[in-house]
UniProtKB/Swiss-Prot annotation:
Official protein name in the record: Cysteine-rich repeat secretory protein 41
Cleavable signal peptide: 1-26
PANTHER family, sorted: CYSTEINE-RICH REPEAT SECRETORY PROTEIN 29-RELATED, CYSTEINE-RICH REPEAT SECRETORY PROTEIN 38-RELATED
Keyword Signal in record: yes
Domain Gnk2-homologous stretches: 33-136, 142-253
Localization annotation: Secreted
Length: 266
């Protein structure tokens, strides 16, 4: 199946992982760019068009009054054929004050990398932003994904693969549990850690909050099947989709691993 956002040169993305620092504090503060895709099929809008005006309105709105408590927003503006749909999702430990800087950076980055594209996605370390002329609420995006992995291998690859996959699967069940709530809202996020031999693995999974819990699990189940291609024996790895993602490392990269949902203390 061909992707509407073009082919992904996955191996080229591995180098990006090497550029990211392993410092917990710096990871928490950075909005490191990871990847982007510009739509090849949705076309481009003209300067001064109704689509551009709708897009500008939505983007200015989400950066000023976005739902930063929950780290997510899906909104639309305009009428067909000038409908604009915009979604952002911040990483599960990057809500509240940590979310706005990443979204602002993503808006600027998307405008620069995909100028006048009606459809585009951009991923940063702590958030993703998607614009489209096509509605996608509660629909799993199976087309647009990529992965990053550490080039170094574990010595006991078989055991490491088995135990890391088991941890990620456990987190997928937790994230998509209908009882995993923040108030009345599904969390759709989980993080945890596990000792494997002499090493400790830190991991997280997350879905965008437009999905219902069953679709969240379906999405995570799908990207976890990509573990062999992405992460076979690797000391760290991530698979990113538009609708869900997972990550594991041999160092802590989140602020907290004790709770499925992590809030800033203010």
């Amino acid at each position: 199946m061909s992707s509407v956002f073009g082919s992904v040169h996955i191996l080229a993305m591995i180098a990006i992982q090497l550029l990211l620092t392993h410092s917990v504090s710096s990871l928490n503060l950075t909005n490191a760019y990871l990847h982007h895709k510009c739509s090849n099929t949705q076309g481009k809008y003209k300067q001064g068009s109704a689509f551009e005006k709708n897009l500008n309105l939505v983007l200015s709105t989400i950066t000023s009054i976005g739902n930063f408590r929950d780290g997510f927003r899906y909104t639309e503006e305009g009428e067909d054929p000038n409908n604009v749909f915009v979604m952002f999702q911040c990483r599960g430990d990057s809500y509240w004050s940590k979310c706005p800087p990443c979204i602002s950076t993503a808006v600027s980055g998307l405008r620069r990398r995909c100028p006048r594209n009606k459809g585009a996605i951009i991923w940063y370390d702590q958030c993703l932003l998607k614009i489209s002329s096509v509605a996608s609420f509660n629909k799993i995006d199976y087309e647009n994904d990529f992965y990053l992995s550490n080039p170094n291998n574990m010595s006991d690859r078989g055991l490491f693969n088995k135990e890391t996959s088991a941890l990620l699967e456990k987190l997928a069940y937790k994230a998509s549990d209908r009882n995993n709530l923040d108030g009345k809202q599904l969390v759709l996020y989980a993080a945890g850690e596990k000792r494997i031999g002499t090493k400790k693995v830190y991991a997280m999974v997350q879905c965008t909050k437009d999905l219902i819990f069953t679709k969240c699990f379906e999405c995570l189940e799908g990207i976890l099947r990509k573990f062999p291609q992405c992460c076979d024996g690797k000391r760290g790895g991530r698979v990113f989709g538009t609708s869900c993602n997972f990550r594991y490392e041999l160092y802590p990269f989140l602020r907290n691993y004790s709770n499925s949902t992590m809030r800033a203390p203010y």
